[in-house]
Amino acid sequence: RMMDGSKFDRDAWNVRFVQRNITPWFTELELRYGQSKIDHVMDTYSMRYLSMMGNQVKKAMNPKRETNTGHLKATFDWPDINLQTGIDYMRDKHLSRMEMNGEGYRHKPYQPQQNFTQWGGFVEGAWTASDSRKFISGYRYDEVKAEYDTLIANNPNKHHTYGLHSGFFRLEEEINGIKYYAGVGIAERAPDYWERGASQVLDKEQNRQIDTGLMWKIDTFDFSVSLFGSDVRDFIMLERVGKDVSARNIKATRLGGEIEGKWKFARHWEIGSSLAYTYGKNRTDDRPLAQTPPLEWKNSLTWDNETLSAGVLWRVVSAQKRYATGQGNIIGQDIGASAGFGTLSFNTGWKINKYATLQGGIDNLFNKSYAEFVSKGADPSAGLQTVRVNEPGRQYWLRLQVQF
């Protein structure tokens, strides 16, 4: 990131209304409305030293965001058929003020940056054709109107309207205790605030994906396999060259899958293991797709008698040698290959009563030094070469959850 987050103020509220069993077939009407406000400060001096030898500048930014959301959904049930339909609304406004060379920012007024208005409608239906076969399908349309408040009125890039179509079809079938599924879908999204900040001429992103898998449960054993393949047209990719960040649309391919198994080998005891891998390619540049995680293997052992619980997790991640330096997304960009690592964690819990649960644990038990491949990069504005940032060492944590 170009700056460090030094102060954060977040406020949010939501209201929800639900009416059930309106008629024998009109089973539920749900209405939600909410608002969130984010006001935070990012700077180059609160959490780092400024060197007089470098090209660092003492500066700060105070962005502010207000988001209003609405959701209305109706659910209908007939014999063997479930139908859900509704509309969504979002109003998103971004403002900011900043300081350069230490003159301060609190006395300055906020300046509008970008604003978004989104309306959407959706419908999803499920048909239980038999005890072993089910069809699910859905469609959604959104219209997103985006505006650059900083551009003059007659600038051709000031206003953008994105019409977004998404839909899917899925088949689920159970044969001899094994549940199979297969699906195909298309999803479109508009560039967000940060992507539009890097380029004013981005097209909407479209992901065409197929997925399939199976789930098998027999006695004390659970097993599942899932596979997917996607063709992403106009994938929105951010690219960093020095201090400059730009965004463009590319063609991308993603393939991946996960295998998972669990075995309850004794009363209260369970052992589990999973293996996941994703392959990504940037077809436009004929190179690996940035920010694609490497092969990961997880193994767990848990004990739980519904009052007390304990468990260990062994996580093994392979080295990632498929990377695209400088390319990625708003979270981070690739900076080179990463080494493999393994970590061990321990956790325990006590269900005090039906309202409260106390949990605690130790992450990275052996205090290993390691870094994730998909992680935030360092700050080039500080005059430093971008390096991979290690994850925390041994961590102790305690959490109390109370529900009413």
Q: Where are the regions that the model predicts?
A:
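Outer-membrane beta-barrel translocator domains and adjoining extracellular loop/strand segments
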Residues: R1-M3, V41-L50, N55, L95-G104, ...
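Face-selective signature of the C-terminal outer-membrane beta-barrel domain
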Residues: D9-E174, K179-G183, F221-L227, E270-G272
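Residues on the lipid-exposed face of transmembrane beta-strands in outer-membrane beta-barrel proteins
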Residues: V15-Q19, G70-F76, G121-W127, F169-E173, ...
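Membrane-embedded beta-barrel scaffold of Gram-negative outer-membrane proteins
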Residues: W25-S46, E172-R189, K204-G257, K262-K264, ...
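Transmembrane beta-strands of outer-membrane beta-barrel pores
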Residues: Q35-D39, W78-D80, Y89-L95, Y141-E147, ...
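Gram-negative outer-membrane beta-barrel transporters
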Residues: W127-I136, D142-V144, D222, L227-D231, ...
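C-terminal beta-signal and adjacent terminal beta-strands/loops
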Residues: D231-R233, S318-T325, G349-F404
